[in-house]
């Protein structure tokens, strides 16, 4: 009897072990790798989660859903490009601390007229995991800092470019006359496309234009066909001045009517199709000058990035407790040019400082101290002393022209840079079937996933 019980127990144990193994194998089979991207991977569970998120967003905006094979291709491509950028940011030591993350989430909540707690509950009602959301925001901030270091901070606008631009505008306020809201579809070509590849892209673009003019909704066409990063948002570029639009598109947009769809527009990145969604006039703008000072702590071989930030936090506490900003700047700032003046940078115009510094400065009230702000130069503690508005027409136009030329160059260079890093990365797509959402079957008759295998 005892032997029988022992054997029975051993048999049940073996069954239990077999069940665990089978469960693990099934679980591993479900959560398989769908793409290898340089040193990282994208899992099917991540792809399914992102596809579900996009589907919820499209349903909320009442956009029609494309076939799963099309949506999966778009979402996976975006995830691949994001993965490349995140890996680059990690290799460059770009980090997003918890304070920056909390501030970003708070700003997102404010834009939705919610408190942070209300916003968190709202995400839960939408089925969005809060931890996943935080990871996504952290990644977006890191990628933004990466692009700023690789693109924004490398762009310089010369006085001659500003003068030439104003001359082309007739030296008047024409730059401020109108803003345009555009829909955009990109049919991409490889960086060194062959004549045959260019021809096929043009033919594809012509087919898209034909469908649009036959009544296809632009948002649906963007989701289905566009290679642009905004494709899943329906290709809406938002409101832009003519000078903020890449030059190859701006030349066409200026003559378009409301609701009009352009013919394909050639650029180094492929063929662009734009739709004039709306246009509006712009009122008179004024130039805001800011009197600002800062303390810079630059990391080095001895002082780590985190130590530099903590040193600034300690200095901020001392200032809030009554210590003099100027004296601390003279004794601690690594910006020797301004340190001898108590950290004073004088009056600065828009566009004069690197973007992360300027964005933080613009968010401050007069006499308010910033939290530590990271730029390519190190960590900054910033204080705005005073602001002035100028209505000097010539000065306003020059600064507006400089700002708009900068935005145009950023857009053009970002498109090329994203294509470059995508082309140079090692990417192996292992998607041999369209992953359906839990409980969903792929609709019959959809395009085979092989159409987007590469």
From Swiss-Prot:
Gene3D superfamilies in the cross-refs: 3.10.50.40, Porin chaperone SurA, peptide-binding domain
GO cellular component, one term: outer membrane-bounded periplasmic space
GO BP: Gram-negative-bacterium-type cell outer membrane assembly; protein folding; protein stabilization
Compositional bias (Acidic residues): 443-454
Enzyme Commission (EC) number: 5.2.1.8
Residues annotated as domain PpiC: 177-278, 287-386
InterPro entries for this protein: OMP_Chaperone_SurA, PPIase_dom_sf, PPIase_PpiC, PPIase_PpiC_CS, PPIase_SurA, SurA_N, Trigger_fact/SurA_dom_sf
Keywords for this protein: Chaperone, Isomerase, Periplasm, Repeat, Rotamase, Signal
Extent of the signal sequence: 1-28
Subcellular location as annotated: Periplasm
Recorded catalytic activity of this chain's protein: [protein]-peptidylproline (omega=180) = [protein]-peptidylproline (omega=0)
One Gene Ontology term of the molecular function aspect: peptide binding
A Pfam match: Rotamase
Keyword Repeat: yes
Class of the enzyme per the UniProt entry, highest EC level: isomerase
Region (Disordered): 431-454
Comment block on domains: The PPIase activity resides only in the second parvulin domain. The N-terminal region and the C-terminal tail are necessary and sufficient for the chaperone activity of SurA. The PPIase activity is dispensable for SurA to function as a chaperone. The N-terminal region and the C-terminal tail are also required for porin recognition.
Record function comment: Chaperone involved in the correct folding and assembly of outer membrane proteins. Recognizes specific patterns of aromatic residues and the orientation of their side chains, which are found more frequently in integral outer membrane proteins. May act in both early periplasmic and late outer membrane-associated steps of protein maturation.
Protein name, UniProt field: Chaperone SurA
Source organism of the structure: Methylococcus capsulatus (strain ATCC 33009 / NCIMB 11132 / Bath)
Gene name of the encoded protein: surA
